[in-house]
UniProtKB/Swiss-Prot annotation:
Keywords: Signal. Residues 1-19 form the signal peptide. The lineage of its organism: Viruses, Riboviria, Orthornavirae, Kitrinoviricota, Alsuviricetes. This is Protein P20A.
Length: 177
């Protein structure tokens, strides 16, 4: 079985959080679980790929030259020296984010279906969150029913880590959504 790049999985997870693609979120979650399981059989390949992937993803998110320098310094200090256990911790956080986002998306769709929002007239706004302190995903469901048509929007936002962890774990989770 070929190992998918962690950077590809992170980018797909980030895009799926923006587009609310339920099926892709489930597939990414399963691919991340397979990646985590591969870390026990092929530690060297997973460690190399996770170092490169996390570094490339975070450096690509930098907005200015100075923030890029700071990010590279953090990456040099943390990512380049990380062990396989630290890599598993990063991957575990991503699995929790994917699981929380699937739960948040299902909960928001349940609210939309159960409250029969399409039959009521007027504006509506619902928000909530799913997940743990490591990976909390907030959903915002808003819209307006004008009688003939209903216009609504669903937005998923990754809140980020509230518990322990290093700086890059906080940055990685909060830069997804």
């Amino acid at each position: 079985m070929k190992l998918l790049s962690l950077r590809y999985l992170i980018l797909r997870l980030s895009k799926s959080l923006r587009t609310n693609d339920h099926l892709v979120l489930i597939l990414i979650k399963e691919a991340l679980i397979n990646y985590y399981n591969a870390s026990f059989t092929d530690e060297g390949a997973v460690l190399r790929d996770s170092r490169e992937s996390i570094e490339n993803f975070l450096v690509a998110r930098c907005g200015s030259q100075n923030s890029c320098r700071v990010m590279k310094a953090l990456i040099t200090n943390t990512v380049c020296k990380m062990s396989i256990e630290t890599a598993r911790s990063f991957i575990g956080d991503l699995i929790l984010v994917a699981d929380s986002s699937v739960s948040a998306l299902e909960e928001a769709k349940s609210i939309k279906d159960n409250f029969r929002l399409r039959k009521r007239r007027g504006k509506y706004y619902y928000s909530g969150d799913c997940g743990s302190d490591v990976a909390k995903v907030k959903y915002i469901l808003s819209g307006e029913n004008r009688g003939l048509g209903c216009v609504d929007s669903l937005k998923l936002v990754c809140v980020g880590r509230q518990g322990g962890g290093n700086v890059l774990q906080h940055l990685l989770i909060s830069s997804l959504g």
